[in-house]
Amino acid sequence: MQQGAVYEWPDHAERFRWRTLNEGSCLEVLAANDEILATVYRDSAALMGDAYGVDDPVVLAEHQAGLATLSTTHVSLMEPWDSMLVHWKGGGSLDYVRSTAATKRIARNKVLDFGGNPEWNHEAILMASFRAFCIYPFGNPLEGVTWANDMPVVPILEYDEPSPLGRAEWMKALAWLVSDSALDEANRVFDGVAARYVHARAQGLPREDSLVVLTGSVEQGLWSAPNSRSFVAQLLRDAGARYALSGEMRQGNVELSLEALYAMRGEVDALGLVLYEPDTANLTLARWIESNPHHAQILPSSGQVFAANAVTCDYFGWWVAHPDAMLRNLRHVLYGEGDGATGDQSPCFKWLAP
């Protein structure tokens, strides 16, 4: 923390904050250990007015407009405050973008296609004009590219937030990159999301004991699951469930042997999954068990498995920006609470039929 500076923290997010010192203001992007990964200034005047000099400042292209995105999640965090996505100039992995507004802009050639990992279209990135290029730090396609040294690259760490509301609140950081009026709209939208989330969380459970839920997937013969500080674990707690790995405080995913997981079968009431299954008509519990020889070993004794199929549910997009709807959906699945209404979106989480 810089002495004499004024810090403004978001309400729920932990990976960014604003700092003001003298006449300079900036956005600081933070790692989990509070290391500053990037210091972002809206223009050169803000940089020059900051009495606290920083190494490698990111100065937005003040004479350009709009944002370029590396992740489809970034687009979904723009849409709540920019319903027509007029500030979206280009992006990667466009085949995975799901929103109607986004696909319309793509169809009208209003958005440049940057390709996707590993075949990034550097020519399209170079041709694009934008205020900032929003990336996730572990997949920067411009790493080591000399002509991109002065490009305003901003790491977006929504995926590393330990709460659903923290993830969604990154819509404010993206809006700040555009303008004060965009930030005002993002604040208004997010306040509504947060109020609905808190209301859903405050509802009592329709049963005396909460369900114990495990989530994760089989990777290279091990079970890989979110830790207890992850947004998934927090979502389950807010839905009234108990996360089966609540004692795991380590950073990153928790890896368990399948033998250890098998021993837990009797302690787990339900298994929660995120899948990508194109054959949606035949997505059943039996089909999931058949898809991997290990799945039969880890099936809870109850036989209950619920899943979000990323083919039909925009799990990494719309639902990130609308955690209130995700919470209502999950509470409805686990406890039959309410009607699980999610606006014009189909429910994301569903029990797998036998």
Model-found features: residue ranges?
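Extracytoplasmic substrate-binding proteins
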Residues: 61-66, 123, 127-222, 246-247, ...
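Solvent-exposed coil/turn segments that connect beta secondary-structure elements
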Residues: 72-73, 83, 93, 138-139, ...
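A short, structured surface patch at a secondary-structure boundary
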Residues: 26-34, 38-139
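N-terminal hydrophobic or amphipathic helices and topogenic motifs
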Residues: 1-63, 339-354
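C-terminal soluble interaction/assembly domains
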Residues: 251-342, 351-353
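Flexible, glycine-rich surface segments
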Residues: 199-286
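Short, structured coil segments at secondary-structure junctions
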Residues: 84, 149-152, 239-240, 301
